[in-house]
């Protein structure tokens, strides 16, 4: 176990005195209608939470955690789930809240939930009853906030959830292909809470309940607000002075008084003199009461280098131990972002997960099936956070790098509750995990380093020597869980971070022997160094070592088990040659991927910055700094995705065309080292038929007469125009030429 952390909160999450409404006790379900409020004896709600998801009273759903957390503080909390946003009526169905509206788009970003990576409309929604699409608007945070303001203009609105969290500064918006303002500015909300919201939510709720106006609540960690100038007592520094990662301060020598002098001369005895004892106030740390001024919205919108620079600074100010506040100008106002909240302790995590969740959807949904709930109803979340720092992932920016783990007893109690209370349980726990399967109880072994480090990843390019990689707590948890009465199997469905797992082969043996249901998913993401370096993912050497150990231990256990690798196509830094090499690797290892994913530029991710700017925010940014190749355009993104499914005949024409253009025609054929077969006679005939039926491309310069022609007429006219001027005329006799 690691040492006691130096990053400590000012007060415990559950140390606030309960609000007077605690006398009502916990509700069976948080009410979604006036009828339910009447049954509870409530005349009003203190807080109303508006969400784009169906209400499932389960700790895997953000609104359930926030609602039950506030309820435990004594507040009366109502839920408005997936309201009709066409008018304000649905937002008034629970009446006027006494304190504030809490607004979130849901567990997923509403745009990612609605559109694919190719900007195509999805036709399902896993967070909606019966998987029905279209029950939430695009940019749901903005729309819901506007309706709340229409319904009750004087009630504060506080934003939260992943959508608002990743849009707290000026950000690139993939769907409109432009830089948008902070969602706090666009929505005109009163406050934004980013990341996991328990600490700021509880503090703000109690301060509002004590009569403090929301306009004066400006010092809460994990919140963003609109200000006209910097907060009083804070000193600022321009971001252009900080475009380098912070350093870990050296740890003082415990016997510093006995160190030799620089010139190696003997130390003369010091003359002892009596001195008055004076009490010195503690020296402020360099990051306390300090803010970083980021380039303004107007500047980052017009200058991609400044955008990349601002993104780099933001990602280096995410350690709650040493992060400074951030300030970014939007017009004549500033978005002020306070430092991140202190992570929850194990005791606080246990208390959050011990709240009286029913672990089922609200009865109002009847027998409707909610796919997101079906996926997690027999799973247990054992930790939060991720120190992997993958460039394309937003978990680190949302939940933080410091792992927040529950105790063994808390997890075991939840497994027993599932066994005893959840309908349809068959004895199989579908997952014990979190953002990553094997980071439970892992954290920095040096409290001083943990407090001051600004590394983006604790495991890239190499595992930090301060990082604990002992998987014994996880192994002990697995063993205790599977020994419970009535538990037949404990599966691990969360992704395994294999570069950490190989540091402790005992974990791989435990996993392969007892906790894999035939297939284990891991995510190498790519095989080539170019894209891997931009993703901040380990090389294939770690994958090969993990596979060797996994296969060995599976064989020892007498089991036939396989690894299912996940890959990303079209990620910044990926050239066509890289994708061809990946496809060849897949074919060599006989992988035929069914589901593949093109890179999806989500707000705030480092990879999204690369996609938009063509610069690498993982290194120092400048106008002459490294340029990153970015595969853009529908055709190139389709090609990269097609190469992951090299075995699909529908992709062969596109792959052949690309291989020929790259000078790799030798990869087309029937030999074992070829990627795709040569076209058949029937394929060539079909291609010719399609070419005959194509219509010539029209531009604004095409004559109107040609534009109005039918394809057959246009083809005839085109063939006529291509003939010589004197075609069809009788040839003159040679003798007549000289006349």
Curated annotation (Swiss-Prot):
InterPro entries: Elp3/MiaA/NifB-like_rSAM (IPR006638), Methylthiotransferase_CS (IPR020612), rSAM (IPR007197), rSAM_horseshoe (IPR023404), UPF0313 (IPR022946), UPF0313_C (IPR024560), UPF0313_N (IPR013704). Pfam families: DUF3362, Radical_SAM, Radical_SAM_N. GO terms for molecular function: 4 iron, 4 sulfur cluster binding; catalytic activity; iron ion binding. Keywords: 4Fe-4S, Iron, Iron-sulfur, Metal-binding, S-adenosyl-L-methionine. Residues 372-650 form the Radical SAM core domain. Residues 729-739 have a biased composition (Basic residues). [4Fe-4S] cluster binds at residues 386, 390, 393. Residues 704-724 have a biased composition (Polar residues). Transmembrane segments: none annotated. PROSITE patterns: RADICAL_SAM. SUPFAM superfamilies: Radical SAM enzymes (SSF102114). Binds 1 [4Fe-4S] cluster. The cluster is coordinated with 3 cysteines and an exchangeable S-adenosyl-L-methionine. Residues 686-739 are annotated as: Disordered. Its cofactor is [4Fe-4S] cluster. Belongs to the UPF0313 family. This is UPF0313 protein YgiQ. It comes from Escherichia coli O157:H7. The gene is ygiQ.
């Amino acid at each position: 176990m690691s040492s006691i952390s130096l990053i400590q909160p000012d007060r415990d999450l559950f140390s606030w005195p309960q609000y007077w409404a605690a006398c009502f006790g916990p509700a069976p379900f948080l009410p979604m209608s006036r009828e339910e409020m009447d049954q509870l004896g409530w005349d009003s709600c203190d807080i109303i939470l508006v969400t784009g998801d169906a209400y499932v009273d389960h700790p895997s759903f953000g609104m359930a955690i926030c609602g039950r957390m506030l309820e435990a503080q004594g507040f009366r909390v109502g839920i408005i789930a997936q309201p009709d946003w066409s008018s304000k009526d649905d937002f008034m169905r629970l009446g006027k809240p006494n304190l504030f509206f809490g607004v979130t788009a849901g567990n997923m970003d509403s745009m990612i939930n609605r559109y694919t990576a190719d900007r195509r409309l999805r036709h399902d929604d896993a967070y909606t009853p019966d998987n029905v699409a279209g029950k939430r608007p695009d940019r749901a945070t903005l729309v819901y906030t506007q309706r709340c303001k229409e319904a009750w203009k004087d009630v504060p609105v506080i934003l939260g959830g992943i959508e608002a969290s990743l849009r707290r500064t000026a950000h690139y918006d993939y769907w409109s292909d432009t830089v948008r303002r902070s969602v706090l500015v666009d929505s005109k909300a009163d406050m934004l809470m980013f990341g996991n919201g328990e600490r700021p939510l509880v503090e703000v709720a109690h301060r509002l309940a004590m009569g403090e106006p929301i306009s004066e609540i400006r010092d809460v960690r994990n919140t963003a607000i609109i200000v006209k100038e910097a907060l009083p007592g804070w000193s600022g520094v321009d971001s252009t002075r900080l475009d380098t990662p912070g350093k870990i301060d050296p740890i003082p020598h415990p016997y510093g008084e006995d160190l030799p002098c620089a010139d190696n001369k003997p130390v003369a005895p010091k003359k002892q003199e009596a001195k008055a004892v004076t009490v010195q106030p503690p020296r402020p740390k360099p990051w306390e009461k300090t803010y970083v001024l980021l380039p303004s919205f107007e500047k980052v919108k017009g200058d991609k280098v400044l955008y990349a620079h601002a993104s780099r600074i933001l990602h280096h100010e995410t350690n709650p131990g040493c992060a400074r506040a951030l300030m970014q100008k939007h017009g004549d106002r500033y978005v002020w972002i306070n430092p991140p909240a202190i992570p929850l302790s194990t005791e606080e995590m246990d208390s959050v997960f011990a709240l009286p969740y029913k672990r089922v959807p609200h009865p109002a949904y009847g027998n409707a099936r909610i796919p997101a709930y079906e996926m997690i109803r027999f799973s247990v979340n054992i930790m939060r956070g991720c120190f992997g720092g993958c460039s394309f992932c937003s978990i680190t920016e949302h939940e933080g790098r410091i792992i927040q783990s529950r105790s063994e007893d808390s997890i075991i109690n939840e497994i027993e509750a599932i066994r005893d209370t959840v309908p349809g349980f068959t004895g199989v726990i579908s997952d014990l995990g979190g953002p990553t399967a094997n980071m439970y109880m892992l954290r920095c072994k040096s409290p001083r380093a943990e407090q001051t480090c600004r590394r983006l990843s604790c495991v890239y390019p190499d595992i930090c020597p301060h990082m604990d990689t002992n998987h014994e707590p996880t192994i002990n948890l697995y063993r205790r869980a599977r020994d419970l009465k009535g538990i037949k199997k404990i599966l691990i469905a969360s992704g395994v971070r294999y570069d950490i797992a190989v540091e402790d082969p005992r974990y791989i043996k435990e996993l392969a022997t007892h906790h894999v249901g035939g297939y284990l998913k891991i995510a190498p993401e790519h095989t080539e160094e170019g894209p891997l370096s931009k993703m901040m993912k380990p090389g294939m050497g770690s994958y090969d070592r993990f596979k060797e150990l996994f296969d060995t231990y599976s064989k020892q256990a007498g089991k036939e088990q396989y690894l299912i690798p996940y890959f990303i196509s079209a990620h910044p830094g990926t050239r066509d040659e890289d994708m061809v090499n990946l496809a060849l690797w897949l074919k060599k290892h006989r992988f035929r991927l069914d589901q593949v994913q093109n890179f999806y530029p989500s707000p705030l991710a480092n990879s999204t910055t690369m996609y938009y700017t063509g610069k690498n925010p993982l290194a120092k940014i400048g106008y002459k700094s490294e340029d990153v190749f970015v595969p853009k355009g529908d055709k190139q993104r389709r090609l990269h995705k097609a190469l992951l499914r090299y075995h699909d005949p529908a992709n062969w024409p596109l792959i052949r065309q690309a291989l020929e253009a790259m000078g790799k025609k030798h990869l087309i054929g029937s030999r074992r080292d070829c990627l795709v077969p040569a076209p058949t006679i029937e394929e060539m005939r079909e291609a010719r038929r399609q070419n005959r039926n194509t219509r010539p491309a029209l531009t604004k310069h095409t004559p109107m007469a040609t534009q109005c022609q039918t394809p057959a007429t246009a083809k005839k006219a085109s063939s006529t125009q291509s003939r010589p001027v004197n075609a069809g005329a009788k040839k003159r006799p040679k003798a007549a030429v000289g006349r």
